[in-house]
A protein has these predicted regions:
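Active-site-adjacent structural elements that line small-molecule/cofactor binding pockets in enzymes
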Residues: 1-176
Length: 176
């Protein structure tokens, strides 16, 4: 989320949720690869803090009324001077799913406090495929901790682990 503008995210996610008839699962993350961080100039900022701000600003866009006047530490969003309601200019689309599509957040580091915070917000973690398995093993307890902190049912089924797979027409093709 930190590498995109909240207004663009709000429009794109609302459109995708509508096109998918409310079946969208929205994947978010702070942009954790060192190459991403450098490429987008995010080396000196708190990416987790910016990710939360962007998410909250998207919510304000979706569930607020135009003209928007949303101020944050990292982004300011306004349509007060260009709002033209008769043609829909300056009014963001809203997703089909209320209050927002289900959210999954990337989990990368061992004993990630971000997983706990995500679970407290009702988001589900998805452990990255390219991290060491003993790091991935630390993610479920942190997820359950967040659910406990939020007085939610400690159901581990919200936790996901990403894996690369190849699907082929037959076993021979798949193993070559």
């Amino acid at each position: 989320l930190p590498v995109y503008h909240p207004a663009m995210i709000a429009g794109h996610i609302a459109m995708m949720d509508t096109l998918l008839d409310g079946r969208l699962i929205w994947g978010i993350g702070p942009g954790g690869l060192p190459s991403d961080i450098e490429a987008f100039g995010n080396q000196e900022i708190d990416r987790n803090k910016k990710m939360v701000e962007v998410f909250e600003q998207v919510m304000e866009i979706w569930w607020g009324e135009a003209p928007y006047n949303i101020k944050g530490e990292f982004n300011t969003i306004t349509t007060k001077e260009t709002l033209t309601p008769e043609i829909g200019q300056g009014i963001a689309p809203k997703p089909l799913t209320h209050p927002h599509p289900p959210v999954v957040i990337t989990a990368l580091t061992p004993h990630s406090h971000g997983i706990t915070l995500a679970a407290e917000r009702g988001w589900n973690p998805i452990s990255c495929q390219y991290v060491q398995s003993h790091w991935v093993a630390t993610h479920l307890p942190k997820y359950l901790e967040g659910l406990r902190n939020a007085n939610k049912n400690e159901d581990p089924r919200g936790w996901r682990v990403a894996k690369c797979i190849f699907v082929a027409d037959n076993e021979k093709l798949a193993t070559n």
